[in-house]
Amino acid sequence: MVNTMTNGISKARSLLQATFVGLALVFSSSVLAIVMEDIEFSSLPGDKIEIRMIFDGVPPDPTGYTIEQPARIALDLAGVKSRLPAKQHPLGSGNARSVTVVEAGDRTRVIVAMKELVAYRARILGNSLYVLV
């Protein structure tokens, strides 16, 4: 009788520990994520634009690729969540037409739509990621 009760308690304790570990993993990914809080745009001479993304911590190095037709720059930010109120950000005239910010799974993708593909530079300074297009 005592042995059966001990086995039942041991199984309940193991189940409780497994549940706690599972919940901790689920919640830790959202707690540890860097959050994009704001995005700003500055027009520069020579039909260039500087995009400044502001985060609640130091952002990760972006990984990205470009597409020639239609002209796009896509930057992936692993482990980043977006707190921006809008996904679409029209830029008006000039080569860079719009910026779209989309959260998908464990990353956020930033897409710069352009009239014509040009090179870009990205740099991190404090809690900001600057992209010069």
Task: Describe the residue ranges of each PLM region.
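Signal-peptide-cleaved, periplasmic/extracellular N-terminal interaction regions immediately downstream
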Residues: 2, 6-12, 31-133
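Bacterial N-terminal signal peptides
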Residues: 17-29
